């Protein structure tokens, strides 16, 4: 160990056996960013573009027309490798009755049940989300306790990436195998990202800029020290990856180690604000890196599809490339991320089967119940999760509704829809990197920045509703009457996604009781993924009722607006104090706590659990 590292580790004392108290290094941050670069391509390029198309196309190759339930949807059923996506579009477009060209509906029979091929991918996604939720809950105990956090992250990454690569061998005759592989891949992706998110509060808590700020004199009343600390944080994040990745972020400091523990987390609003800003910047940088990787691979995949004549094999080939990208760039994360073991089970949980995987799973489900009970007494986490439930549902529903609207009512071709996806991703990168500057220019807090994103997001359904106004409708454009209007809305959607993805994740991390990261991020992920089934279902009902999608914009406008009053009620300072108090209360008698409680020693602990 380097001399500098030895000095650094003396600043803090281990709080439990195996506690990794080393300051966050540049190499460790690079490993965290690397996994975002590796895995974000799956959700953007696979789930957002090629995976649904591949599943639908393979089911279509084995399906029949809904209109007569006899005519095969594919004219080259026995030669799936020669089935051109463009040819399928042309063939299917022959069957429509007046008005704009609409792709004909095809059905397949699975265990005797008639299923629309367009719904096949959606059902596959729903099943994967259900399994994903169970898996996330079950593995949270092993992630929070012991040294399994990194092991699980790497394991899920390998299984998910290899599963995605296996699409290369899936042909339409075994399209159900493709559905199973998609379920495995999406489940592993979601679980791995929950584990990645659980590293974020730990990286922030041990970040040198936080430790440095904790050792310096209290801030002046004019906030000059807070501004200086913020500047240091900015410098560390902006140059952390570019500098020598093998060295610690912070060089050695002199200090009295006996008083270090009391100094590590001084409970002042300035420290809380500094950690939140740092968490937001790391999260934003990670999201931005992930989007950049997704854009690069998306362009490569589009070129591959064109070069291979847009066949069904082309779609399977790009899924292989997505899985290969995911696998290769997981390697730096596996090498550079530290395990950061969590606290061991307390004596009340230690038994013969405690350390077995069954014991971890049983403990995890009990912990979920306890987490839900504790959340009821953490007002700000409860408010935020309620807002996030609605907001994430709105994000997922707007994305799917917009694509469906563009296809069926604006008659946009697949290439144009792919271009919208690229534009949205570019805007997402800009959003991830620019919202921090916007918040500084306008002096916005993290919650206020999230609120600004919600207000901007609200413009999307409101713009679609303009099409109901007779004066606008008579113009023939505006209010989503022309295909080109989807492109600026894609920019708005991307900017909003870049901001919400980074700010919401880091904002929630500041409200989590230390030592319970994986459990609470599991709740965060379940709230995120579990909500996505409701919005699309309601949009489907509205569409069936009125015969078109545009009336669903009313529902979307309401859905996006509802999180706004909830976010206005969230107080991050109060939430941080409650989280630290709860963490201290949950520790067994005489154990070290994860940080220092607020200076107000007379403050009562949270309500009885």
Swiss-Prot record:
Compartments reported by the entry: Vacuole membrane
Major place of residence: membrane
GO BP, sorted A to Z: amino acid transmembrane export from vacuole; autophagy
Compositional bias (Basic and acidic residues): 225-238
Keyword Transmembrane: yes
Primary role: Vacuolar effluxer which mediate the efflux of amino acids resulting from autophagic degradation. The release of autophagic amino acids allows the maintenance of protein synthesis and viability during nitrogen starvation.
Membership in a protein family: Belongs to the ATG22 family.
Protein name: Autophagy-related protein 22-1
Species name: Neosartorya fischeri (strain ATCC 1020 / DSM 3700 / CBS 544.65 / FGSC A1164 / JCM 1740 / NRRL 181 / WB 181) (Aspergillus fischerianus)
């Amino acid at each position: 160990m380097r001399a500098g590292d030895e000095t650094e580790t003396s600043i803090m004392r281990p709080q439990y056996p195996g506690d990794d108290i080393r300051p966050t290094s540049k190499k460790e941050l690079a490993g965290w960013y690397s996994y975002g670069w590796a895995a974000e391509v799956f959700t953007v390029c696979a789930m957002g573009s090629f995976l649904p198309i591949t599943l639908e196309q393979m089911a279509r190759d084995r399906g029949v027309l809904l209109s007569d339930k006899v005519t095969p949807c594919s004219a080259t059923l026995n030669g799936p490798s020669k089935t051109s996506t463009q040819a399928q579009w042309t063939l299917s477009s022959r069957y429509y009755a007046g008005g704009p060209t609409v792709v004909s509906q095809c059905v397949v029979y699975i265990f005797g049940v008639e299923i629309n091929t367009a719904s096949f991918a959606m059902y596959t996604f729903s099943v994967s989300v259900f399994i994903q939720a169970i898996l996330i809950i079950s593995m949270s105990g092993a992630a929070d306790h012991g040294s399994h956090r990194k092991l699980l992250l790497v394991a899920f990454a390998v299984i998910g990436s290899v599963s995605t690569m296996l699409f290369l061998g899936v042909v339409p005759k075994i399209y159900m195998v493709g559905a199973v592989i998609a379920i495995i891949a999406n489940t592993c992706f979601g679980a791995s990202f929950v584990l990645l998110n659980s590293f974020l509060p730990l990286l922030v808590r041990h970040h040198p800029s936080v430790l440095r700020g904790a050792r310096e004199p209290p801030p002046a009343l004019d906030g000059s020290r807070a501004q200086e600390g913020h500047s240091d944080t900015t410098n560390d994040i902006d140059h952390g990856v570019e500098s020598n990745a093998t060295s610690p972020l912070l060089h050695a400091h002199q200090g009295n180690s006996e008083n270090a523990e009391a100094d590590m987390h001084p409970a002042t609003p300035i420290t809380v604000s500094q950690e939140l800003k740092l968490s937001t910047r790391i999260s934003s940088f990670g999201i931005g890196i992930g989007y950049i990787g997704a854009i690069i691979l998306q362009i490569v995949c589009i070129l591959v599809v064109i070069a291979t004549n847009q066949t069904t094999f082309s779609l399977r080939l790009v899924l292989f490339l997505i899985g290969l990208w995911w696998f290769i760039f997981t390697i730096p994360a596996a090498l550079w991320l530290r395990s950061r073991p969590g606290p061991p089970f307390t004596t009340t949980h230690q038994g013969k089967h405690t350390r077995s995987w069954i014991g971890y799973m049983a403990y995890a489900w009990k912990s979920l119940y306890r987490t839900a009970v504790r959340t009821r007494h953490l007002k700000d986490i409860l408010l935020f999760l309620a807002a996030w439930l609605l907001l994430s549902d709105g994000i997922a529903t707007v994305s799917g509704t917009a694509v469906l609207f563009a296809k069926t009512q604006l008659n946009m071709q697949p290439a144009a829809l792919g271009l919208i996806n690229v534009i949205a991703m570019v805007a997402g990168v800009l959003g991830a990197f620019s919202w921090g500057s916007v918040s500084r220019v306008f002096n916005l807090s993290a919650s206020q920045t999230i609120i600004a994103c919600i207000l901007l997001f609200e413009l999307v359904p409101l713009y679609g509703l303009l099409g109901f106004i007779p004066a606008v409708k008579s113009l023939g454009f505006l209010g989503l009457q022309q295909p080109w209007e989807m492109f600026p809305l894609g920019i708005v959607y991307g900017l909003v996604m870049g901001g919400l993805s980074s700010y919401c994740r880091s904002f929630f991390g500041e409200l989590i009781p230390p030592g319970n990261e994986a459990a609470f991020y599991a709740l965060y992920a379940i709230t995120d993924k579990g909500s996505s089934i409701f919005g699309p279902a309601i949009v489907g009902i509205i569409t069936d009722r009125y015969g078109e999608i545009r009336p669903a914009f009313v529902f979307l406008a309401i859905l996006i607006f509802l999180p706004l009053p909830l976010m206005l009620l969230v107080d991050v300072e109060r939430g941080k104090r409650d989280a630290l108090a709860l963490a201290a209360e949950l520790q067994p008698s005489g154990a070290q706590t994860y940080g220092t409680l607020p200076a107000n020693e007379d403050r009562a602990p949270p309500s009885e659990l």
